[in-house]
């Protein structure tokens, strides 16, 4: 049953109907459409469109429909309704007869879909935050278990300074914490109810929109009807948050792929998140991480698509806006799946402590410590930087580490070097000295872990 047939003298061509209909994807808004319809029925009582008895009858029927939807949402797709709004109204009329035709009084599909998608987005934010928080908890647990795992830290993918695997884990805790807080910010901005805005100019019935907003668990009603039905900022914002978080996940995945390589051998991924080769029997491929990395472009593509869709639209509603749903549905599903998979990857991750330490001892990652040592002896840092650079070249030529050089060898480059230099060149000293807040010293990392465990409890 179409909701708009009276104006037309010819039926829509099947080709157009197939092109125009959205039930195949907006069926996911069924629960929200029913929720909004129950709220609207209560508002209509207050403006004398419905009696209390009629509203109770409608609410009972809508709740029955809600139970049916929750038990088998895919059954909706067997219908040929244009969209989820048409489907809900049709099923309601089947249950209560002509009374069901009164429900749409004063309401447009424009404000109806606007409230549906906001309700859906609000629920998804809550679910996504729980997934992100769960990933953070797993990162913190992994950090707690790997505080003694010294490894190289990298810049430009070159060994730079020693860190611990725990410090690496806690870096991602911080990234995902920003994603979590962005979801909170987005939730607060989208927590406004557009229902009662009509097609664009507001409803002709004196509906108490503030009361309606509270009934539907919104903070307050939107302030401008024209903006209310054309606003898709919340979708763009969620797509933006998803895209940025996927970039964080992609970096996590890339690190894991590198750490898991035979050349690095820092970690071993579980058999349960890897796959083999159809030709090469020895292969164990990090497919979970590669798919996380690969799906990032898919989510970013949804953001780009939505921005381009909106950029030239005149006020207020345009059918172009129907294109908002498939992108947001797919992007948030993909994001949550990737967050959950990253959590699963951490579950049985094995860190090769011996190998990470061996790698940390190579690459002259203690060179900065030698420069700081010279500064402590009164050498200006810029001079000490140059001196250490020359010392490293010498050590490379001799096939030695800095800690293996003799005092006479050190003094070829600076006379201030004494026997106390060896103490500061050890891995432990390199870590311990980074004791400012946020640094890699074991004390600071332990503090960060304890603070995060308290925060995420």
Curated annotation (Swiss-Prot):
EC number(s) per entry: 4.3.2.1
Against PROSITE patterns, the record matches this protein to: FUMARATE_LYASES
Q: Which InterPro entries does the protein's record reference?
A: Arg_succ_lyase_C, Argininosuccinate_lyase, Fumarase/histidase_N, Fumarate_lyase_CS, Fumarate_lyase_fam, Fumarate_lyase_N, L-Aspartase-like
* A Pfam family: Lyase_1
Does the keyword section mention Cytoplasm? yes
Principal subcellular localization: cytoplasm
Name of the protein described by the UniProt record: Argininosuccinate lyase
């Amino acid at each position: 049953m179409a909701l708009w047939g009276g104006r037309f003298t010819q039926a829509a061509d099947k080709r157009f109907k197939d092109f125009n209909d959205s039930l195949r994807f907006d069926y996911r808004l069924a629960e929200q459409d029913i929720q909004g319809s129950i709220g609207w029925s209560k508002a209509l009582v207050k403006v004398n469109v419905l009696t209390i008895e009629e509203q109770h009858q409608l609410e009972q029927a809508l709740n029955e429909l809600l139970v049916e939807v929750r038990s088998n949402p895919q059954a909706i797709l067997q219908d040929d309704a244009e969209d989820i709004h048409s489907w809900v109204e049709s099923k309601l009329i089947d249950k209560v007869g002509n009374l069901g035709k009164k429900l749409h009084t004063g309401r447009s599909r424009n404000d109806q879909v606007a409230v549906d998608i906001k309700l859906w987005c609000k629920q998804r934010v809550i679910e996504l935050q729980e997934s992100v928080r769960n990933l953070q908890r797993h990162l913190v647990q992994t950090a707690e278990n790997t505080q003694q795992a010294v490894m190289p830290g990298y810049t430009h993918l070159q060994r730079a300074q020693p860190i611990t695997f725990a410090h690496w884990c806690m870096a991602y805790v911080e990234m995902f914490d920003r994603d979590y807080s962005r979801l909170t910010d987005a939730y607060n901005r989208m927590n406004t109810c557009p229902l009662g805005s009509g097609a664009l100019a507001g409803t002709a019935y004196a509906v108490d929109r503030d009361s309606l907003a509270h009934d539907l668990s919104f903070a307050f009603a939107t302030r401008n009807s024209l903006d209310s039905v054309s606003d898709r900022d919340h979708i763009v914002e969620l797509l933006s948050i998803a895209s940025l978080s996927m970039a964080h996940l992609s970096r996590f995945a890339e690190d894991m792929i590198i750490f898991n390589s035979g050349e690095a051998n820092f970690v071993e991924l579980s058999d349960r998140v890897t796959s083999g080769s159809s030709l090469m029997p020895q292969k164990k491929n990090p497919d979970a991480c590669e798919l996380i990395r690969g799906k990032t472009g898919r989510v970013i593509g949804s953001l780009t698509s939505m921005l381009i869709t909106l950029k030239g639209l005149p006020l207020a509603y345009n059918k172009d806006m129907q294109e908002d749903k498939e992108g947001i549905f797919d992007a948030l599903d993909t994001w949550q799946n990737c967050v959950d998979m990253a959590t699963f990857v951490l579950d049985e991750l094995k860190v090769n402590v011996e190998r990470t330490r061996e790698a940390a001892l190579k690459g002259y990652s203690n060179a900065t410590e030698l420069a700081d040592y010279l500064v402590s002896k009164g050498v200006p840092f810029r001079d000490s930087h140059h001196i250490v650079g020359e010392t490293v070249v010498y050590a490379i030529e001799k096939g030695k580490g800095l800690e293996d050089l003799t005092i006479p060898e050190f003094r070829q480059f600076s006379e201030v070097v004494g026997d106390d230099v060896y103490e500061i060149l050890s891995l432990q000293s390199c870590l311990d000295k980074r004791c400012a807040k946020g640094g890699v010293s074991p004390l600071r990392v332990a503090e960060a872990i304890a603070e995060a465990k308290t925060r995420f409890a």
